[in-house]
């Protein structure tokens, strides 16, 4: 089957926002107006099309990024609905990795909120062009210009309105288009009848001022427009649209639109803006990768003529078809039934069926083309972030960075039958979600699961019970501490056993130095003259990695340490891999005596919103929890406090804040970085882990 939509008429977009900004409702309306659904489902009634997991419909939040395909104005729009809750950051990250553009949805009463900042930062890292939709203009307290101001103040974004609202709250009845300089008035509840009129007299002056500011802001991003503007020549609508498109695609400018998805206003105009201003796969730089055979950098331009290259960005288990692998095609064409090379794993995979997804319903297709997003059935070894390419033109595309989990809890099956099912369930859930880790404590046999936050683990335990019918007892959440060295040292590890049977002999000298935060463990072989034979070097590295899994102070994993093996000796007969592994672990223990080992704890960026009268209480809460205030700002009658607080001190804080503010205070937290725990706390942690 020939390609239905050209690359120029394809848009791959994400919808991203803070939790509760109305993102899923916005996506629902897009599906409604593009003819994908015939009845609108409200999130707060638990009937949304995109939120298809039971937990999502119950909680009214989006957990997994559902992918769907819609058509608008002769274009194909592939939409990924991403979660707004911070515990599901990986879902946002992996969608951004495969998108070409995004719509950031704001609650126009609150403007930029904490999770908006997180997803905005991630989108900036991936260089994703964005338009902004200030939603909920019908809500009490809605303030469009305040929302625009928060984009400047909190995100330092060069964002400018290309629309203005007519009225607000209950009186929100239409939108002024600052490019056409016309008013769009809504005359029915479904938002399908729109009258285009002249701008009402009382809004004309504000509209003219805003248009002038818009032209100036766009002209600043383009030399030719700037010359015309400075010489007083008129900039035509076509030139303005082209200028906005170019600046938006270059991530130099962010158009801001307004509306109310719930009240069916502004969504079609936002779809027009997606087509007008967000890039097609042809507008963005060709994806780069590395040839696994030559290590040379290669590009894959968006074209059906190029060799096939795609990135797997999500794994899901579907009750009807089994394991689904979502992938984005960057170049080339793929037919169902063909073979591809998973270059990340070095394995050949067969594509069974190819499905085009619409939330949780699906349509089988024969072929996918460059720029498409689809799901494949039948891939056995592919996981999130793997590259799938033509067997004759291999390339490894840049993968998806996975954040480390910060919170863990113990799960215990209720019966022997549950134990077997639990192993399978946890393995499948971990395949779907790379931020979810499962470990078994070797000494106690307990199963420990780790994730990005309490809600994250709640949802996964819930899925284990519902989807896999596993009954389990769940322990209290615990912090995922880490350990590291704060000083450099040299240490010897010497292991010798020569009594009875085959002897063992391993002798190493290793220099340990602190590594940069986030760099993890790095091993360097600096052996000269074969004092440690080459075949035993991997055993030394393996011995260190295994020992570092249970750190020297309290048994927490060690991170950010460099180890340089620079000397040692061996025995012709008695030396073995095992002996050198043990010698390496002894060197690590020895190093701990002088390398200033430290325990690290996850620090959360906490944003607390509370009535002004309770500001003193909130500041007290932060200080009492070993936190430090990073900034404050007033918003109406509330104060917003941003602070860094250890995760260990945040358990149960929701209850404390609720009672201090009579239920009017709220907080959000997102993992920010790891930091040394104070000495007194370190001693307590060590005592606790040793059961003293």
From Swiss-Prot:
Residues 8-282 form the tr-type G domain. Keywords: Cytoplasm, Elongation factor, GTP-binding, Nucleotide-binding, Protein biosynthesis. The keyword Ribosomal protein does not apply. InterPro entries: EFG_II (IPR041095), EFG_III (IPR009022), EFG_III/V (IPR035647), EFG_IV (IPR047872), EFG_V (IPR035649), EFG_V-like (IPR000640), EFTu-like_2 (IPR004161), G_TR_CS (IPR031157). Its main location: cytoplasm. GO terms for molecular function: GTP binding; GTPase activity; translation elongation factor activity. One of its GO terms (cellular component) is cytoplasm. GTP binds at residues 17-24, 81-85, 135-138. GO terms for biological process: ribosome disassembly. Coiled coil: none annotated. PROSITE patterns: G_TR_1, G_TR_2. It is found in: Cytoplasm. It comes from the Bacteria. Belongs to the TRAFAC class translation factor GTPase superfamily. Classic translation factor GTPase family. EF-G/EF-2 subfamily. Catalyzes the GTP-dependent ribosomal translocation step during translation elongation. During this step, the ribosome changes from the pre-translocational (PRE) to the post-translocational (POST) state as the newly formed A-site-bound peptidyl-tRNA and P-site-bound deacylated tRNA move to the P and E sites, respectively. Catalyzes the coordinated movement of the two tRNA molecules, the mRNA and conformational changes in the ribosome. This is Elongation factor G. It comes from Streptococcus pyogenes serotype M49 (strain NZ131).
């Amino acid at each position: 089957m020939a390609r239905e939509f050209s690359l120029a008429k394809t848009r791959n977009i994400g919808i991203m926002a803070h939790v509760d900004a109305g993102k899923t409702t916005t996506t629902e309306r897009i599906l409604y107006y593009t003819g994908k659904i015939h009845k609108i489902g409200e999130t707060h009634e638990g009937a949304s099309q995109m939120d298809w997991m039971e937990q999502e419909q119950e909680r009214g939040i989006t957990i997994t990024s559902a992918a769907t395909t819609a058509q608008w104005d002769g274009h194909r729009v592939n939409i990924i609905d991403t979660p707004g809750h911070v515990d599901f950051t990986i879902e946002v990250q992996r969608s951004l990795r495969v998108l070409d553009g995004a719509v950031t949805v704001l609650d126009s009463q609150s403007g930029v909120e904490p999770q908006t900042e997180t997803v905005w930062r991630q989108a900036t890292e991936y260089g994703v062009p964005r338009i902004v939709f200030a939603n909920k203009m019908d809500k009490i307290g809605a303030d469009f210009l305040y929302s625009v101001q928060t984009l400047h103040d909190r995100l330092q974004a060069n964002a400018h309105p290309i629309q203005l609202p007519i009225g607000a709250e209950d009186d929100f009845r239409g939108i002024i288009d600052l490019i056409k300089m016309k008013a769009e008035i809504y005359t029915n509840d479904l938002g399908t009848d729109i009258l285009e009129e002249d701008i009402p007299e009382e809004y004309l002056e504000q509209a003219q001022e805003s248009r002038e500011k818009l032209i100036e802001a766009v002209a600043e991003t383009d030399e030719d427009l700037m010359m015309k503007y400075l010489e007083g020549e008129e900039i035509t609508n076509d030139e303005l649209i082209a200028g906005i498109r170019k600046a938006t695609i270059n991530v130099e400018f962010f158009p801001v639109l307004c509306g109310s998805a719930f009240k069916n206003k502004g969504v079609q105009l936002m779809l027009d803006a997606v087509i007008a201003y967000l890039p097609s796969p042809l507008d963005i730089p060709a994806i780069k990768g590395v040839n696994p055979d030559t290590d040379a950098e290669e590009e894959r331009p968006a074209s059906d003529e190029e060799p096939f290259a795609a990135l797997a960005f999500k794994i899901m288990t579907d009750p009807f078809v089994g394991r689904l692998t979502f992938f984005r095609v960057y170049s080339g064409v793929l037919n169902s039934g063909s073979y591809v090379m998973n270059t990340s794993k070095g394995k050949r995979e067969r594509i069974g069926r190819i499905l085009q997804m619409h939330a949780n319903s699906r349509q089988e297709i024969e072929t996918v083309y460059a720029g498409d997003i689809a799901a494949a059935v039948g891939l056995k070894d592919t996981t999130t972030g793997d590259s799938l390419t033509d067997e004759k033109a291999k390339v490894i595309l840049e993968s998806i960075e996975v954040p480390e989990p910060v919170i863990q809890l113990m799960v215990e099956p209720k019966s022997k039958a549950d134990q077997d099912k639990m192993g399978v369930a946890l393995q499948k859930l971990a395949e779907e979600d790379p931020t979810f880790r499962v470990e078994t404590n070797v000494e106690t046999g307990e199963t420990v699961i780790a994730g990005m936050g309490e809600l994250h683990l709640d949802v996964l335990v819930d899925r284990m019970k519902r989807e896999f019918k596993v009954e389990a007892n769940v322990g209290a959440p615990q912090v995922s501490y880490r350990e590291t060295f704060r000083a450099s040292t040299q240490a010897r590890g010497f292991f010798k056993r020569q009594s009875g049977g085959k002897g063992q002999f391993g002798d190493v000298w290793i220099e340990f130095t602190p590594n940069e935060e986030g760099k993890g463990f790095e091993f360097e072989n600096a052996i000269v003259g074969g004092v440690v034979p080459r075949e035993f070097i991997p055993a030394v590295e393996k011995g260190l990695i295994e020992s570092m899994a249970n750190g020297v102070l309290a048994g927490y994993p060690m991170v950010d340490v460099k180890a340089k093996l620079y000397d040692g000796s061996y025995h012709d007969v008695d030396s073995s891999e095992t002996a050198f592994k043990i010698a390496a672990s002894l060197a690590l223990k020895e190093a701990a005596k002088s390398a200033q080992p430290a325990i690290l704890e996850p620090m959360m960026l906490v944003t607390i919103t509370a009535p002004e009268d309770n500001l003193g209480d909130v500041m007290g809460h932060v200080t009492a929890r070993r936190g430090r205030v990073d900034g404050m700002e007033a918003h109406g009658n509330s104060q917003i406090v941003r602070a860094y607080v250890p995760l260990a001190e945040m358990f149960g804080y929701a209850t404390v804040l609720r009672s201090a503010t009579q239920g009017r205070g709220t907080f959000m937290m997102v993992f920010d970085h790891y930091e040394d725990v104070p000495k007194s706390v370190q001693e307590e942690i060590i005592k606790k882990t040793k059961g003293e």
